[in-house]
Amino acid sequence: MATISRKKKKVKVTPEGAVHIKASFNNVLVTITDMQGNTVSWSSAGKNGFKGSKKNTPYASQVTSEAAAKEAFDLGMRYVHVFIKGPGSGRDAAIRALQGAGLDVKTIKDITPLPHNGCRPPKRRRV
C-alpha cells in the first residue's frame, strides 16, 4: 500500500551549530546539529552514491561534507564547531569542504576515542 508523501518542513535554524564527522576505515558520516544537539542535516558516503572501497576516500568525504553543509547553509546556519572522530582518510578533506560550502569553522576538536590498552585490535592485513 502506497503511503502519502509529505513535503519536508523547512525550519530556520540558529546561525551557530556543530558538525560531527565520523571517519571510519569503511565510511564517512557527517551530521550537522544545532547547539542543543538536534539534527539539522546529515550525509554519508553511501548516501552520495559511493559503493565499497570508494566510500573511505578523501573525495567521498569531500562530497559528503559539501552535501550536508549545503543543506544546513540553506536553512540558515553560518558558523560551526567541528568534532572529528575516527581514523579515516578523509578527515582534512571534510573540513576543507565545509569551508568551501560557505560555513565558517570556529573550532576543530578531535574526539577520537583512544583505549588505555583495552580490546585487542584486529590482525594486520597481508595482501
UniProtKB/Swiss-Prot annotation:
Parts forming coiled coils: none
Summary of the function given for this chain in its UniProt record: Located on the platform of the 30S subunit, it bridges several disparate RNA helices of the 16S rRNA. Forms part of the Shine-Dalgarno cleft in the 70S ribosome.
Organism: Prosthecochloris aestuarii (strain DSM 271 / SK 413)
Signal peptide: none
GO CC, one annotated term: ribonucleoprotein complex
Quaternary structure (record): Part of the 30S ribosomal subunit. Interacts with proteins S7 and S18. Binds to IF-3.
GO BP, sorted A to Z: translation
Protein name: Small ribosomal subunit protein uS11
Family membership noted in the UniProt record: Belongs to the universal ribosomal protein uS11 family.
Gene that encodes it: rpsK
GO molecular function annotations of the record: rRNA binding; structural constituent of ribosome
